[in-house]
Amino acid sequence: MRKILFILLIITMAGCSSKKKDLFEVIIYECEQKEESLNLQFEFKGEVELPLEKICDSYKLLQDSIISVMFGEELVDYPTKKALRVYADSSFAEYKKVYEEIFDNAQCTMHDAQLYNYETDIKGKILFYDSNVLSYQRELYTYAGGAHGMTTKTNYVFDIKTGKILTEEDVFGKGFERKITKQLIEKANILRAKGELPEEDELYNSWNIIPNGNFALTDSSVIYTFNPYEIAPYYYGIINIELKLEN
């Protein structure tokens, strides 16, 4: 038997100024699905912030690009609330398939097992925009049993007129790697001195700290995001290194 409970909310952002109501909307979808015959429980929460027409004339291109990086290119043509629902359903189906295979390989019955909980929480938000670019962040939390879940953050910089994802080379020009790497290592050493990064060893050291494509722009800086295990053990969390654009 499969039980589904879902809540769908469409919220227009209300900020300090009434203008924000016309600039962005936030669409939230929550569902809980149970497959009692398999002893499975799945919880999903999705939240996506989208620009509206007053941001720019090409807002639809931006929306399509955001939906593509959030949920997959195949869901771009879906209404946003349906894209969230389809993404949730496919996540549950994939989770269920994995556990069916586990139990088949273990040669035990589903009723012999404990209740397996799986959680997915995906959130997309606008970090910054101006007349040229829009910085966006996709945050994904998953829990599939074990000691803890995993959160990752992925940043995207879009050309606000075309919806195209901009690369580091698009923003900084050719040959950016050496200069950006030098600045990242300098900032990382400051974090290390504060205890916010581990002391260097064979696994985590300056060789790991390079431009990784996971960057966002603000009006005065570029922020590089390093997810757990990239440059530090899990318990250090997500590391952001901010570089001033003037440099």
Residue locations for each model-derived region?
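Compositionally biased intrinsically disordered regions enriched in Thr/Gly
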Residues: S17-N247
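Residue-level signal for mature regions of secreted extracellular proteins and peptides
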Residues: L9-I10, F24
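Positively charged n-region of N-terminal signal peptides that target proteins for export
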Residues: M1-I4
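Intrinsic disorder/low-complexity detector
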Residues: F6-L8, K161
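C-terminal motif of bacterial Sec signal peptides marking the signal peptidase cleavage site
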Residues: T12-G15
